[in-house]
Each structure stands twice: as C-alpha cells, then as structure tokens.
C-alpha cells in the first residue's frame, strides 16, 4: 500500500502500453505534490488526482526541472503516511538522478513530437 508513480513517453497514436520510454517511483511525495499542483492549476480537484493519466507540456517539464534542482523546496508534503511524507527529503535526494533523467527524456520527446504523461496510484 502506498504511492506508486509512473511517467511514460509515447507517440500520439499509441496506447499507454505502447510507450517508447517509462520510469516509475515509489513514495516520492514531493514529486507527487509538484504534479498535483499542475493538476489543480488546470482547474481540477485535488481529490481527483489518482489513477489519471495527465499529459505534461514543455512548460510543466521546465517547472519540474527547477523543482528537482531545488529539492522540491516549494513542494513539501505536509501529510500523507502512505505517500512517504515522513522521509520525503531522503526520497527527493535518492530520486535526483532519475528525476533529471526523466526531465531530459521528456524535453527530448516533446521536441520530437511525442507525448509525455504522468500518473499515480495510491
């Protein structure tokens, strides 16, 4: 039980399972806070951000790049035992290379006309 997170890159006409590249995280609560802030900024309810495929834009990835490089200092998770909030600083440090790999892959994919998605399950 807990927070599982996924991101993938695919061609526009491909299904989710026909992705070109993917990555996953486990209980990376600060990444979740960041992604949830995008979801809410788009006019969605915070409570609805579970098991939803959210397409990310180049602007989203630019913001994510900044968040990663600052250890998500503006996206501290205040609660959420099952999200791993109690060890969120360590999770951000441990995921740093993976997060940057995702950022780089996402920028490259968008430049090539591919789509980038994020989803979570908790």
What are these regions (language model features)?
Residues 1-114, 120-122:
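Acidic (Asp/Glu-rich) sequence patches and key acidic residues
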